[in-house]
């Protein structure tokens, strides 16, 4: 089965530089990842125009976010791509937890039948972004996608927002009523505002590898504590479309990311997981993670959405799904404000409600992360005692 083929999106000279025409939109969206694109589509369904700018011109490289929960799938369905995601994605609801080679626990996330969408599907982020870009084309008068448009700085006053944009053809100023910062965990806009994440940083490092192979593994989530193929650490296996499998391996806090990403170090580790099955490396990364958020998500006319506002560990699939909940909460409210049917005070409810949602995700994600990679002492003793009783 063919792997995903990365094709660059076309760069088009902005009208501001092509003929001196000044453009503006009710909403400027910075970031053409899943959250920014979903926000553009959601606003368009409410009749609100947006201009989306991104400094790249290709979908995300590597699978990145893969686990999309039932509620997020329902939101994607409302936005018009739910069926495509369901058709392509790997459906799953069962998870198994092992200690060594022994199964100690299993769970069913959606035991009853009759639902349109499953508990989860696994679908690589690049497919989600591709589907959303194609969906944006259904709103030619409402969504303007501008790739290779890099935000240098933003300013705001009581009348609107101005973004200074750099392109291959030069720089220009883009104006709007509101700006959504959907530019991810390393948000340039958040840094410009001097906003710090508050919460916990986890020093533990993990190897993440997407491998292409033929295997008869069921469509389940498998997690190991101290497996025989990776002693003293933890491991995770997920099936994805195109015969791609996600493998996460705990490395320890002192692992050198650049060394661990080298094929000569990755391949022997993967061989121990998959046995004698032949495989090809599709994507490799090494990461540590945070469970943190900024103090406020709404800063006058600049609104932070998704990873620019809050980040969690990848365990529990609360990152991309949490961002989709932000979109679902915000866009109808922003449409009412832009349309003059509500005041800015309505946006404060987004701030309060999604901070509550982020705090819940951060709490659960932090607990899961501490259980998976406990500190020596009390945390480790608790984890081992819990596993021994399972």
Question: What does each model-identified segment do?
Answer:
Residues 23-25, 168-178:
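Core beta-strand elements of the Rossmann-like FAD/NAD(P) dinucleotide-binding domain
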Residues 1-27, 42-46:
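Extreme N-terminal leader/targeting segments of oxidoreductases
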Residues 61-139:
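Active-site-adjacent segment of FAD-dependent monooxygenases/related oxidoreductases
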Residues 375-390:
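Catalytic cores of secreted or luminal carbohydrate-active enzymes
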Residues 147-161, 285-286:
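A conserved short coil-to-beta-strand element within the FAD-binding core of flavoproteins
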Residues 56:
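Residues in the short beta-alpha loop(s) of Rossmann-like NAD(P)-binding domains
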Residues 103, 133-134, 143, 172, ...:
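Conserved FAD-binding catalytic core of PHBH/FMO-like flavoproteins
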Residues 32-47, 53, 132, 181, ...:
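Conserved mid-domain beta->alpha element of the FAD-binding
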